[in-house]
Amino acid sequence: VAIKLRGNPDHPFSQGELCPKVNRFLDRVHSPDRLLHPLRRVGPKGRGEFEQISWDEALADIASRIGDVISTHGGEALLPYSDAGNQGLLAMTGLNPRFFGHMGASKLLRAICGPTVGAGLRMTNGTGRGMDALELEHSQLILLWGTNTKLTNRHLWPTIEAARGRGARLVVIDPIRTLTAEAIDEARGDRFIQPMPGTDIAMMLAMMHVIIRDGLTDDAWIAAHTTGFEELRDAVADWTPSRAAAATGVAAGVIEQLAIDYATVRPAGIRTLIGAEHHENGAMFFRTLGCLPALTGAWAERGGGIAKSVGSYSEDLIDVAALYRPDLERSRGRREPRTLNMSRLGEILTRPHAGASDGPGEHALIVWNCNPRATVPRAELIRRGMERD
């Protein structure tokens, strides 16, 4: 029985300290509300009427039903549906792809959250990757753009404080006055900038306008490592600070000074996370943001560039290919199964008789590590799809 959790003191990022979420994991394990036995629905769908059954009975029933779906409609009529859950590596990258891949089940594109970040940044820097977040310790100007780091990333905040202790200035950009925004010290040159929600891109375009207008670009780096500078220059020519001020609610002088500071206080590092992508222009946010360090050459400086997720610290802990065994998806002469977008679950479930061109409709949905009725768009359509026979 687990009675205590401890962090790994040798981990380069956490250094053995657990975040509040992980510290409470055992409360969930031992919660009186935790389900310990399988429950089978006995009433109409949506009523929430269940009976307790044994594990043997539950597993046999599930296996029989899955087998019937596969034999009648094919493997792609089965949709495994999961997301980040508790962020555990095994929970997210465990044996489930291997298990369902062997059945030829439909694959899931987990596009409801983080992938937008990589897709947007990839359009600018080609890889979608950013700088090591711990390199912010070497920054002289740190922009926390749309992230409440002090509250939600306690492992990174000491790195930022260490940089500030050596003279780094902090700029917090957020529509909300967060705990991180309250941590700024204007006497030291820190600043809190509060654009209206969803208008960040306008401010970025105006910053690029100022940087190019004032000759603050790193022309040698641009010539050696970028393409399309002339097109970008023309695109931002009309995005004056005054125009951006009208869109963002941030004073033109504030935007202008931010642009000058970003280009002249070196190295300048930007830290942003998934909160910035949670609106209709999420991918474009990161595509545009990636242009700023390209204009100034900050990508080439230690402590410069854009820091995103710290997931790279766990990339080598699990041999994902050995777990997934993607070759099983095409075993026995099968083609690779189709991939369905998780954010389209409502549409997927309400088309049970799809045509041959896009494969069979879904007749079995297996959900774990997520709650699609609460987190996926078009909840009412999802409810209708789940209630069908």
Where are the language model's segments positioned?
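A short, aliphatic-rich alpha-helical micro-motif
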Residues: 136-137, 186, 262-263, 359, ...
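Short, conserved loop/helix-junction motifs that constitute active-site signature segments
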Residues: 162-166, 384-389
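Core structural elements
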Residues: 233, 256-267
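N-terminal export/assembly segments and adjacent metallocofactor-ligating motifs
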Residues: 1-214, 251, 335, 366-369
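Flexible, glycine/threonine-enriched loop-and-boundary segments that flank and lead into catalytic domains
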Residues: 373-388
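A glycine-rich, hydrophobic/aromatic-adjacent loop/helix-cap motif
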Residues: 262-358
